[in-house]
Swiss-Prot record:
Organism: Penicillium janthinellum (Penicillium vitale)
Lineage: Eukaryota, Fungi, Dikarya, Ascomycota, Pezizomycotina
Location in or out of the cell: Membrane
GO biological process: alcohol biosynthetic process; isoprenoid biosynthetic process; mycotoxin biosynthetic process
CDD domains for this protein: Trans_IPPS
A Pfam family hit: polyprenyl_synt
Protein's recorded name: Prenyl transferase janC
A GO cellular-component term linked to this record: membrane
Length: 327
């Protein structure tokens, strides 16, 4: 005997049973799982040919990419003390590349030198952990095999991370956590750059020479490198293609030298607005200020002044992207 309305009820029960089975027995597809981004892609070695994110980034930059600097500092080190020569290059690769791995995660970068950023393939959790693991390995190896280099490495690594922390705090707290006077802003940014980037370059001199006699030179080289990188981020179309985004720093509300100068330029309130709320409109108007002749000329003058005394060193760095984007 059929009961009126039984059909819809039985249908609902059947649908509910099917849904229960699907949700209880069938795993969530990887592409739909919110944790998949953190985990990374399965079998990344089939994509890159390499199982490790550090090895992947090292392949992009090339092994021992600091070698030209080592040869200029000490032309005979490779012959006189080959184990130390190799160790210095291993340390520089490890510290520099591992900082990049974590930096790309912090910035949410999609690309590094035109290639997918490591965390986009291996996942941010594994990429960050591998970076910490590699740095720990190199610290342990240095302490055991070259104990005389360990204090230099530890001190400079501390300074690098202090500078990075300053930059991240500014990004977190926004313009309210940054000095208000133009002179103080520039000084604060230079201090951060001297720690984050300067300590990396000074580390090379400390490791090779085991003294601080090259500190002044490497601080200048580092400042030029930081300034050049800051300028490329907002003025270079080639760099934008490699990063996959124009003005990535501004989108990330990160302080850079052009942005710091633009805060006190005519119409600088647009830069403040973009740092507080990076909407497309605010970003667009802020870029007009950052790319204005006023800011661009100041950046160009600073590049020329800081690079004048270290031209031979800068040729070794080999960065040639053109600053072709204007307001």
């Amino acid at each position: 005997m059929a009961f009126p309305g039984a059909g819809p009820i039985l249908g609902a029960i059947a649908v509910s049973s099917c849904l229960y089975f699907l949700f209880d027995y069938v795993p969530i597809p990887r592409w739909w799982d919110k944790n998949a981004y953190l985990i990374g892609q399965m079998h990344p070695d089939e994509i890159t040919g390499l199982e490790c994110p550090y090895a992947y980034l090292r392949q992009i930059y090339g092994k021992y990419h600091w070698a030209p600097f080592v040869h200029k500092i000490s032309p005979t080190l490779q012959k006189d003390d080959y184990p130390k020569y190799v160790m210095v290059l291993e340390i520089m690769d490890a510290i520099h590349l591992c900082l990049m791995l974590v930096d790309d995660i912090s910035d949410g970068s999609d690309y590094r030198k035109g290639k997918p950023a490591a965390h986009k393939i291996y996942g941010p959790t594994e990429t960050a952990n591998r970076a910490y693991y590699r740095v720990t390995q190199i610290l342990a190896q240095t302490t055991k095999e070259f104990p005389n280099l360990a204090p230099w490495l530890m001190g400079d690594l501390r300074d690098i991370l202090e500078g990075q922390d300053m930059s991240l705090v500014w990004r977190r707290d926004g313009i309210g956590g940054f000095p208000t006077a133009a002179k103080d802003r520039a000084a604060a940014y230079r201090k951060m750059a001297s720690l984050k980037t300067g300590a990396l370059f000074r580390l090379l001199g400390h490791l090779v020479l085991e003294n601080d006699s090259m500190d002044e030179v490497f601080t200048v080289i580092a400042w030029y490198s930081q300034l050049q990188n800051d300028c490329k981020n907002v003025y270079s179309s080639e760099y934008a293609k490699l990063k996959g985004l124009v003005a990535e720093d501004l989108h990330n509300r990160e302080m850079t030298y052009p942005i710091v100068l633009a805060l006190d330029a005519p119409e600088g309130h647009w830069v403040t607005r973009a740092l507080e709320s990076p909407s497309p409109r605010n970003i667009r108007n802020a870029l007009k200020v950052i790319r204005s002749k006023y800011v661009r000329d100041k950046c160009t003058a600073e590049l020329a002044e800081s690079g004048a005394s270290v031209k031979e060193w800068l040729q070794l760095w080999g960065r040639t992207e053109k600053l072709d984007l204007k307001a």
